[in-house]
Structure formats: C-alpha cells, structure tokens
Curated annotation (Swiss-Prot):
The gene is leuS. It comes from Rickettsia felis (strain ATCC VR-1525 / URRWXCal2). A motif ('KMSKS' region) lies at residues 602-606. Keywords: Aminoacyl-tRNA synthetase, ATP-binding, Cytoplasm, Ligase, Nucleotide-binding, Protein biosynthesis. One of its GO terms (biological process) is leucyl-tRNA aminoacylation. This is Leucine--tRNA ligase. It is an enzyme of class 6 (ligase). Belongs to the class-I aminoacyl-tRNA synthetase family. CDD domains: Anticodon_Ia_Leu_BEm, LeuRS_core.
Amino acid sequence: MNQIEQKWQQIWYDEKAFEVSNESSKPKYYVLEMLPYPSGKIHVGHVRNYSIGDVIARFMTMQGFNVLHPMGWDAFGLPAENAAIKNNSHPKDWTYSNIENMKKQLKSMGFSYDWSREINSCDPQYYKHEQKFFLELYERNLAYQKESLVNWDPVDNTVLANEQVVDGRGWRSGAIVEKRYLKQWFLKITDYAEELLNEIQNLKEWPEAVRSMQEKWIGKSIGANFHFKIKDNEDNTIEVFSTKPETIFGAGFIGIAFNHPIIEKLISKTPEILSFITKCSHITGSSELEKTEKEGVFTGLYVIHPFDSNIVLPVIITNFVLMDYGTGAVFGCPAHDERDHELAVKMNLPIKQVIETDIDVQKTAYTEDGILVNSDFLNGLTSNEAKQKVIDEFEKLGIGKRSVYYRLKDWGISRQRFWGCPIPMIHCEACGIVPVPCSDLPVTLPDDVSFDGHGNPLDHHPSWKHVNCPKCDKSAIRETDTFDTFFESSWYFTRYCNSNATEMTDKKACDYWLPVDKYIGGIEHAVMHLLYARFFTKVMNEQNYVSVREPFKGLFTQGMVLHATYKDEHNNWLYPEEVVKKGNEFFHKESNNRVVQGRIEKMSKSKKNLIDLVTMQEQYGADAIRLFVLSDSPPEKDLEWSASGIEGCSRFINKLEHMFEAIASLIDDVNSEINKELNRLVHFTIKHVADDIKHFVLNRAIARMRELSNAISAELNKEVVDVKTVRYGFNVIVQLLNPFIPHITEEIWQKLGNKERLYNSAFPAFDESMLELDTYVMAVQVNGKLRDTYEFKTSASEDEIKQITVNLPKVQKFLEGKEPKKIILVPRKIVNIIV
C-alpha cells in the first residue's frame, strides 16, 4: 500500500495537482484547518482534523469549485524556547527541523494542500507585516501600554491571559499563577465589543455552542453606576456598578475587590485583611472565581444608603468582585443573588426580600424578575419599571447614571519571552515611547542568544536592545517583550490569499477568496483565537487590507481522538505499544508485569496514550488511517482509537482491490437481467453521500458507501451478473470514496482505464427518476390489527389496492364473508379494512 501511496503523492507533486489560481471562472471555495504548532510530530488528533478538511476540499473540487486549501505553521511559542533551554540551542533550529518533519508527514497522508502558499509565522518576511500593522494600531490609539495586574507564571516566566489560566495554574507549566503589576501592551478589542457581540447572530454557519461562548465572553451588562457616601467620611464615596439597581432596598453590604484603591486610602490593613488580600491575589480570572467558595473580610468601613440615611451597610473585601469589571465594587443583595446569599449566610449579614416570591429567601436566593416589595417608592413596579425609575432617581440626585459594561477586557499582548515576534517600539528617556520607523522593519531576533532558563533572554542580551532613538538619536532601549502568539494566528488566513504579497495582504486576492467558507478546528479556541481573528479582520477592513469584516463564514469544531491510558505497578504512564492484552487483563510486553488500564482520555504526551503515526502508516497505510478517523463517529463527536477499527478499514480497502480484480475479469453477458434495485441504490448513494458530505455527516457517508460495496459484492456472487450495473456502480463507488481514501481510489481509477485524474474528475451525477422504487410494501390491517403485508407496484391505483387487499387469503379469514364497512388508505404505508 505504501508504494501506491508514494506513487500518487509524487504524481500530485509533479502535476502541481492542488495549486490553485487566483484567476478562475469557477466559483471559489476556501477551506482551512487551523494551522498547527510545529511540535515535531503529527498525531492522530491532527490527522482527524486535516482529514475532515481534505474530504471537503476534494469534494468541492469535484463539484466544480476553485478550491483554496492551504497549510502553514504557527511557529512561535514557549515549547521551542523550552527545548532551546534544554538542548542549549536556538529555538529557530528546533522549530525549522520540526516543520520539515511535520511537512513530510502531512504529505505522506495525501492531504491536498497548496504548498506554494505555505506560511511560517516565525519568518521575518511574515512577521514584518504584523509589526507594521501594530504601528498602525498604535497610531490609531488601538495599541497602548499601561501598568497592569497580570497573571504571572513563575515557571515559564511569562504573563498569561486569563484564558490561559486553568484552575489557578498555567495552562502549559501547571504552576500556581501569581499576580504582579507589570507594564504591558494592550490592544483595544473593547472598542469593538458591541460589533463583535451583534455580529454573532449573523454567523449562522457557526456551532451554537461557540456563538454562545463568545456572547458570554463578551458579556454585555446594562445597569447603573452610582455612589455610596462613606459614613463619618462623607467627602469620600464608593462607586458601584449594578445590573440590578432596582434591588437597592435589599442591599446588605458593599463588596469591593481586594485591590480596590479605597483599601490603600482609608482602610487599616490588619493581619486578617492582609492575609485575605494575599489569598485573593491568587484568583486569576472569572472562570476560577465561579468555582471558588465565596468569602469576605470586614474593612471597618460603612456606607450610607442613598435613599435612607438611617441604613448603613458594611464594606467587605470579597473574593468574587474583580477590579477589572465595572468599578471593582458592588452592592450585595443577598435575597436575590446567589453569591451574595452565600456570603451573607457565612458572615451573618441581613437578608431582605425585595421581589415578590413564595421562596424562603433566608434559605435560598430568588434570582428571577418580579414585582418589587419592601422597596419604598419602587413598591408594586415590575423589575424593569423599577430599574428605570431608580436610575432616574440616581440621575436627579446627581449620584449615578445609566451604564454599560462588558466582561471582555482589552487584549494583553505582551509576553516576556524570546521566541516571539518583537514588539517594534523603543523606549527613550528624552522622547518616551517611540515607534520603530517602518523602513527599519522587520525588527528581528538575535541569533547569538543565551538561555539560562531565567526571564527574558532579550532583556539581558548584551547588545540587541541597545539602539539610538529614531527621534533624538540618543541612546535608547528596545522593547524586549514579544507578541502573544495569538497575534500571528489572528490574520494568517488573509496571507494565504497571496503569500508572496509585498504588503500585509494582496487586497485583490483577499476580495476573491475571503471570507473563509469553512474553518475547521477545536472548540477550545472559541474565546481566544476565533474572537481575536474577528477583531483583527474588522481593523484590517478599516485599514483597507480586506473588504470583509468577518473572517469565517462557516465554522466546524471537530471532536477529539481518545485512547485508553495505562500505568505500571510503579504508577508510571505507559505507551499503548508497550502493553499487550491477554484475555481481559493487560501486561507489560517486556516485563510481563500486570498493567492497570485507566480512563479513556484525550491523547496527550504527558499520559503517553498516543498512537505513533509512522508505525500506523507502515502497518496500514495513510488511506486506512484517514478512513478510520472519519468512519467510527460523527466528526463533531469524540472518537476512541481502536486497533479493530483501523484493521476493519484496512480490510475494506483490500476488499476494493479484490472487487476490482473480480470486475476486471467479467465478460459482458447480453442475457443478464438488469438489477434495478442495485441501479437504484447506486443513484441513491450518489445523492445521499453528497448531502452527507455537505452537512459534515462523514461517518454516515462512509456507511452508505460500504452498503453499496456490499450490494455490488452480492451481485458479483450471483451465477448471472448484471455486468453493466456492477461496472457502473464500482466506478461510482471509487469516485465517491476518493475524497476519503485518495491513493487507492486513484490507483483503481487508472486501472479501470480512465484517462482523467480522479482528483480532477466531476463528482458523479444521479438520476432523480432512478430513485423511485418500482414497488413498495404496505401493511394490511383488519379493524386496526395487522393481518398481512403486500408488495404493490408504484403504478397501482387506489381501487386496485383495495381490491387486492380485500381478496388476500389472510384478510378473507377475518372478514368471515362480510362486506367491509370502510377501507382507509394511508398512502404507501397502511390499508385498514373496517368490518
């Protein structure tokens, strides 16, 4: 099989089979899988992702489209730098070596990529364009630097975005994340929050789950900002933001963030307060906050209720109010908010009901809208009416106003690492922050770099950071932070339209290809990469780089590939190839010691539950692997890797070869009858396989093709074979299977005597009239009970059906010589004879 696969891969390469032109009279179709990080090896999870994309690309080509299906490398990032530290080498060497190996692996799988458009994000000829784009953002005040409380990973020595912190730990290192103040570069994605939110409803070809995740991440909240005076210090106030200001008469406390400025200004830091602040500083984001037990510590301060000066509320530092959301302060209404209720119960704070309900709010919060009670001038109003009225009162008193907040924060793009795109800015004592002139781009990374494992190598490089200021020519310092790697992946899809463009994009090429028609990747990128790419596209549109404002018309999120995990008696993880099954138990191949099978989980390096792709290819071939990862489960669902599954796919491919040999030896028989049912099945399969591929039900498409192959095999085993239909059906099945298993189908297609390449052939057409059955079976009932079935010709009239069914022997038995009172017909399904 490997020889056949290598043969066709070479032919495709020689013929430039998948290189497409930007000038074509055909309709365009742009299919793209999320570009990979060059880790060194393609794993089976990648293969599934790329196989899905390849089926779509090849299918759309056969449908007559001009298909762009490119590939490139998201090549900056921490693993390369960590490998450099470990091996005392430059990250570039490790990265380029990995790219070479992975490219070879991708080609060996037969994916139909246009390699002439390959991009590499660590190539200065790529990132010089994003450096220029950053300067344009800076000029428009969409890029800025400020001191910010950041998530610091003490192992990787870098800042992490909130999304990169999982359960308080760094997503890569697993280290407990700390909070630090650092000067950071930000992009003003919040300027686009409203458009990003509103446009979600137009992304109709995106999964609902992703759309919902983006809506929640942007998190629009409409409410009010208003001030509480501090008791005994009325010159000072605490400003709160609330989405439910109508519950103001149920206020039980004021909750503030651990880093709220009022703490430094007015609050004595007791050991209890200091300890609590330290504890809060380890909470890294709202996702972790939601899981954390709600706690607080009293500050000693009270505020005065804005509508009743006799009511004073304690000011409490809480672990669930964040400084970067709203004002960093809220009023707590325990009766009608779950978090506030949890804290009130714990700290013995008052719980006052202000919305009508039968629920006992002392036991559980009532969080729905309703009619206001115990609320002075708001009594009897609905929640919405009360909200409008109380905000009107705030505005009359001059203590508050209507406001809108977003959960979405500006995108922190600074990373204190070497292996990333340098931020093209210079710090001058005399001139301040000075952009690098465009004529000096790209700012490249130095080759002579030392990795001692501590901090950012750019910061302690002896010469790289020392430059003259472009404005005053005095000594200055380069910015030593590099871009977050999501910067590169936020615009790469535009570069594929013409990867040799002298500017960031070739506008004409982008106008032809964009938006991407189908984007394929993991749902884990829903609120980072996909949101950032949408943001970049809007800004690029305003900078006249592209005409679209949304990058991806359709999105498909594939499931993961899973495998069982194994551990030895010392609790060490084992690779699947180190384990052998004997009966119902597992043993180590070499030591023969018992092995414990663990959970079936996502394939990962750490748990060693990986399948070596090279070994699988040598054993089964690329086509069998491709077929298996698409056939055992719907593409959007997780897939469990199984040896029996891939062996079954390998047998199916061998069966195709045997079928070809059997068909090739057939001699035309003019006396053979046409197998109408087989002919109908061929046309039925063409129609429904096309529909299945269009709707990404690839496993069902494969099942239909297997069914057709079984029907052809059954016909071949008859004494008198319908040669014409068998040959036609086999040609069709080879064409239908080509997007899934391209190598063996090209080989068989050629042996069938076809001159045109299969990848370039038209998808087979079906005849609608052939889909009609000559006959159909109806259930025959007497008084609603099934008594018989009968196969009718499609041409049978109602009268004929009634006459035939009444005279059936099994029906006559129950009629007992009586005439039917009525005969009810449900077309093509049931005849019910009423006696």
